[in-house]
Amino acid sequence: MSAAQSGTTSVSTQFLANIIGKPVSVKLYSGMMYKGKLESIDGFMNVALSNTSEHFESNAHMLKRYENDVFLRGTQVMYISEA
């Protein structure tokens, strides 16, 4: 692994560690967006959220439904951002 890749990996790991317990938005490859409190994340990008809302891709502000706890499989996660 090059120095640049190593630096990027440590920054990504640090970012993910710092947002646990905070509100996040998780975009899936299917186009769905989930917004909730990040409870946990693992090395495979599997994500557990609490107090979660699900939104349509075409209108991120349009609430589809509200869920308490949601588990998202890492292979489906496009990105995670702090809300």
Curated annotation (Swiss-Prot):
Gene3D superfamilies in UniProt: 2.30.30.100
Similarity remark: Belongs to the snRNP Sm proteins family. SmF/LSm6 subfamily.
A Pfam match: LSM
Highest taxon above the source species: Eukaryota
Assembly with partners or alone: Component of the heptameric LSM1-LSM7 complex, which consists of LSM1, LSM2, LSM3, LSM4, LSM5, LSM6 and LSM7. Component of the heptameric LSM2-LSM8 complex, which consists of LSM2, LSM3, LSM4, LSM5, LSM6, LSM7 and LSM8. The LSm subunits form a seven-membered ring structure with a doughnut shape.
Protein location: Cytoplasm; Nucleus
PANTHER family documented for this protein: SMALL NUCLEAR RIBONUCLEOPROTEIN F SNRNP-F (PTHR11021), U6 SNRNA-ASSOCIATED SM-LIKE PROTEIN LSM6 (PTHR11021:SF1)
Gene Ontology biological process terms from the UniProt entry: deadenylation-dependent decapping of nuclear-transcribed mRNA; maturation of SSU-rRNA; mRNA splicing, via spliceosome; tRNA processing
Keyword rRNA processing among record annotations: yes
A GO cellular-component term linked to this record: U6 snRNP
The protein's name: U6 snRNA-associated Sm-like protein LSm6
Keywords, ordered alphabetically: Cytoplasm, mRNA processing, mRNA splicing, Nucleus, Ribonucleoprotein, RNA-binding, rRNA processing, Spliceosome, tRNA processing
Transport listed as a keyword: no
Any GO MF annotation of the entry: RNA binding
Residues covered by the Sm domain: 11-83
Function: Component of LSm protein complexes, which are involved in RNA processing and may function in a chaperone-like manner, facilitating the efficient association of RNA processing factors with their substrates. Component of the cytoplasmic LSM1-LSM7 complex, which is thought to be involved in mRNA degradation by activating the decapping step in the 5'-to-3' mRNA decay pathway. Component of the nuclear LSM2-LSM8 complex, which is involved in splicing of nuclear mRNAs.
